[in-house]
Amino acid sequence: MMQMRTHTCNQLRASDAGKSVKIVGWMENVREVGGNLAFVVLRDFYGTTQVVVEDEADLKIIKGLNKESTISVEGTVRERASKNPKQATGDIEVVPTKIEVLGRCRYNSLPFEINRSREADETARLKYRYLDLRNPAVKQNIILRCQVVAALRAAMTEHGFLEITTPILTASSPEGARDYLVPARKHPGKFYALPQAPQQFKQLLMTSGFDRYFQIAPCFRDEDARGDRSPGEFYQLDMEMAFATQDDIFAVLEDVLPPIFAKFGTYNVASTAPFRRIPYNTAMEAYGSDKPDLRIDLTCKNVSALFENSEFEALRGQTVKMVDITDCALTRKQIEKLLTDCEVQSGSKAYWFKVDENGEIAGGIGKFVSGVKDELAKVLTLKPNTLVVVAAGEYATKSVGVLIKTFGAACENHFDKERYEFCWIVDFPMYEIGDESGELEFCHNPFSMPNGGMEVLLKAERGEIDPLDIYANQYDLVCNGVELSSGAVRNHDPEIMIKAFELVRLGEEDVKKKFPAMYNAFCYGAPPHAGIAPGVDRMVMLLAGESSIREIIPFPMNKNAQDIMMGAPSTVEQKQLDELHIAIVGDVEKDD
């Protein structure tokens, strides 16, 4: 059997001159010179090669094809008279002896230029994703994703973890987001759910006697899109360890991740073990965020006490937080523009003042703070050319977090950009008051072990302590201001589990009903265990230097959770609904 090709389009060099070769690919570009000469740029997965068409019959074939048609070229390699140093194969060209059409592009014009597809409208890019992915710059992100996943698998295997797949069809459980439900044809009125995470299965593996588990796990959550979150599905490096503590988990990831980030990242510098550990409350107080970007050296100070009787109503009696930015060269216009950006992100108005060359407070709200300059100087650096940005009010903490990230990124002397800076956020609150319910709810993972175990839960039950003061043995991994993962030491004791759920108004029967397998397994003797699940998509997004997670997913949905290339979601035939015992009630969105 003859080979389809002898070389790829990135392989031939000047040393190959005179060789007979066969290459295949897409016609990226055709440039005709007069009526008897054409230059064709042939592109495959690996690169491009110039083909010089001089034969009349071959010219006729080329002229009858549209760009992006696929062809096979048999011919001879010759050295170019005019070389192109920007191209890997720029020293040579192929003179064909035979051209064969493999697949015609039947359209005279394309939805966008392949090599400029990133400039195209996102809807067009998603609809014609198979064309978008022909762009080497777009394709490179997918290649990077493959390389990172392979490196993660190798590293986890080296650390003694077994890759075990867990079910995709499972039971619905209250894990935070909405489930994707799958009707069970053989069980009318009942549904499977696609797993939001393999949380229960991986804990059950630990109770089954496995010691170290991992998988590149698909997770399905019916939630809205964000820049760093894709709707529908995502993938995570899911891992769990039996007879393990928080420190055991930290040790594995602190060994696995830095080499991968340094090797594959836009920057080649990454934190080394041990990563900095910051308690949740400290992170919120110092950075206004539980996802601090430690490349930025700015922190905030709470100066509320100085403004209890301020003349400025926006500060008077409010929570007031300030960030001092020394040696700041931003102009007034730049400051105002950044403040406007921050207000859009945080939903709260922010303010500023500066210390001029003479050490005097000026600009912005300076006249309202100059009276407490001496007191401010005890907590802020107020040397000449210092800018101070101010957040005030009910949402001051959120607002100041946005100010730190926005102004920090704008001031090069406060932003060590070209590195990957990891940190652990630890000691999260176990409970919170729900925004919608107004009642006590789990803050994050309901399966976390509370710090203090049963004793602290009983104290809360008796009213001796506020449940909001209970902390979980839970942790987040953050890199460059992006949350990569949440994890926890698990609550493996069924009695402690029930007591933890009782505080959020779920009794023993509720726990047994919602988590029957895990509860029963724990009753047969469970090991203390811990785990975490860094998001693969977010990691690759960081490594690629992309701001949108859709850029590193081969076939992403749009912001409205639609796959406009495949036409999903879509209506289905009535016969299918009848088989599943489903009736559509209410208005139905028509297919486009």
State where each predicted segment sits.
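Class II aminoacyl-tRNA synthetase catalytic cores and aaRS-like
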Residues: 1-592
